[in-house]
């Protein structure tokens, strides 16, 4: 027996670990350490530090004189002050004046792309929210009634909407709420 204990003490490679044990710290501990490292080194990284220092210099206005700032902007865009196109890295103009090619049709196309939602989309959103509220535990009927008032369209659409919500409320075992909805439906008709 003493030979085995001496062998284990001398040669740790023969010792088997349990599957749960590992050399690295636990997942939660690693996450905490990573979070602490991020908090401590938030402004210490090369990229963040250089960007922050440039931002601070630009905000204070002490780092770059305005004349150099204009030339740097021109280098970035490729245009000089006389609107001539330039090659990057040189100040020699390439030639020709650059003009804008916007027309009124382009602006109209962009305006129509941001049209408001249709009645059907609005009603579908309201229905999703209503079903979500119905499935929640509790009696928050005021919020549901406010959403039902937001339904858009003719009376027939509103009637179908109320009927579908009544069915959903019955399915969710909300008998008292079904009674309230039926009363509102009768008043609406």
UniProtKB/Swiss-Prot annotation:
This is Cancer/testis antigen family 45 member A2. The gene is CT45A2. It comes from the Eukaryota. Belongs to the CT45 family. Testis specific. Expressed in cancer cell lines. Signal peptide: none annotated. PANTHER family: DEAD/H BOX POLYPEPTIDE 26/DICE1-RELATED, INTEGRATOR COMPLEX SUBUNIT 6. Transmembrane segments: none annotated.
């Amino acid at each position: 027996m003493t030979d085995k204990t001496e062998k284990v003490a001398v040669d740790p490679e023969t010792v088997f670990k349990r599957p749960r044990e590992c050399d690295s710290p636990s997942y939660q501990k690693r996450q905490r350490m990573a979070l602490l490292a991020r908090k401590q080194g938030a402004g210490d990284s090369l990229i963040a530090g250089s960007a922050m220092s440039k931002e601070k210099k630009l905000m204070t206005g002490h780092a770059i004189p305005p004349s150099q700032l204009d030339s740097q902007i021109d280098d970035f865009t490729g245009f000089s002050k006389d609107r001539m196109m330039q090659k990057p890295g040189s100040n020699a103009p390439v030639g020709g004046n650059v003009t804008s090619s916007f027309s009124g049709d382009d602006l109209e196309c962009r305006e129509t792309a941001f049209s408001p939602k249709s009645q059907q989309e609005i009603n579908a959103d309201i229905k999703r929210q209503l079903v979500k509220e119905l499935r929640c535990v509790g009696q928050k009927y005021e919020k549901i009634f406010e959403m039902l008032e937001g339904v858009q369209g003719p009376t027939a659409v509103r009637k179908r909407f109320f009927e579908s919500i009544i069915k959903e409320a019955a399915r969710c075992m909300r008998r008292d709420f079904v009674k309230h909805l039926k009363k509102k439906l009768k008043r609406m008709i």
